[in-house]
């Protein structure tokens, strides 16, 4: 077991999230971020998201006509992670999880967290996913390092971050959202032949919802920038993030456009879509997110 240095974390707070936060090993390095993998079943085999199955594997299954099945994380694995957190000397756990409108992960962690006598566990529904959720986790670590108290983190800051983080992403096809039962409030478009691409965000109840649509893939990046600009208003302090699902070169183009449009960001993060969300979104996703830090 590694020796934990609590110099920058005197309250001994660990961060727990799940594989749908899309945080890379590099983004987690040196931080007390623990990741609970969701489960994915392909045929008779079950895999752990981000460990034994990745988005590229899901795309292959989808191309072959097989729709993988997603499921909750393993309860025993969650217990093991919490045991490990306690064994390393942490006393508190700030848990931020995939939207309860898409998954039961939040409730699962909440119930198990309540049963712990050795850890104080505060569990939050991110009402988001991908780097929308990841941005909340990463900014929470910045606040922990800055000395923010546990009470302020749990009672004010994290709820504020969740309410002020806005991810948007393009969906190349609605086929998998429909098949996987996660279509939510996304408008089912019949104009496939018209090359209509929906831009999707999260509704207040955590389900996916249509926010815009464009004609043709080339218009996606500009529309994502427009969505962020429409949200910006009078805010002056913000973080930015972009993500992709099987479209890394286009994400780099999008990153440049987002940075040019909003040059005064405090942090800029990038990510690759996880295997779980890839089951419903398929390949070709582009996403952009803005997170406001002022009230």
Regions found by a protein language model. Give the residues of each.
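N-terminal glycine-rich anion-binding loop in soluble enzyme alpha/beta folds
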Residues: 13-73, 77
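Broad hydrophobic/π-residue packing in well-ordered secondary structure
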Residues: 42, 47, 57-59, 78, ...
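Glycine-rich phosphate- or other oxyanion-binding loops that anchor nucleotides, phosphorylated ligands
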Residues: 65-108, 155, 162
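Short beta->alpha junction loops
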Residues: 73, 125-127
């Amino acid at each position: 077991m590694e020796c934990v240095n609590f110099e920058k974390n005197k309250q001994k707070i660990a961060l727990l999230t799940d594989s749908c936060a899309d945080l890379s090993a590099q983004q987690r390095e040196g931080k007390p971020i623990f990741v609970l993998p969701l489960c994915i079943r392909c045929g008779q085999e079950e895999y752990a998201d981000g460990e034994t199955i990745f988005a590229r594997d899901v795309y292959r299954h989808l191309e072959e006509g097989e729709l993988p099945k997603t499921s909750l994380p393993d309860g025993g694995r969650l217990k093991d992670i919490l045991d490990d957190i306690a064994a390393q000397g942490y006393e508190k756990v700030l848990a931020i999880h995939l939207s309860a409108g898409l998954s039961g992960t939040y409730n699962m962690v909440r119930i198990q967290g309540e049963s712990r006598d050795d850890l104080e566990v505060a569990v939050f529904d991110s009402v988001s996913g991908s780097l929308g959720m990841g941005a909340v986790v990463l900014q929470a670590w910045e606040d922990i390092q800055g000395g923010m108290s546990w009470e302020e983190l749990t009672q004010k800051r994290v709820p504020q971050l969740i309410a002020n983080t806005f991810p948007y992403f393009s969906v190349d096809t609605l086929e998998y959202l429909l098949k996987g039962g996660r279509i939510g409030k996304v408008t089912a478009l019949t104009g496939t032949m018209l090359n209509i691409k929906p831009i999707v965000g999260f509704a207040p109840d955590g389900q996916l919802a249509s926010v815009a649509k464009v004609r043709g893939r080339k218009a996606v990046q500009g529309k994502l920038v427009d969505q962020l600009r429409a949200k910006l208003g009078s805010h002056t302090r913000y973080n930015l993030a972009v993500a992709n699902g099987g479209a890394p070169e286009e994400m780099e183009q999008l990153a440049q456009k987002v940075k040019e449009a909003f040059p005064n960001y405090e942090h800029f993060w990038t990510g690759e879509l996880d295997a779980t969300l890839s089951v419903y979104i398929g390949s070709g996703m582009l996403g952009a997110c803005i997170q406001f830090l002022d009230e």
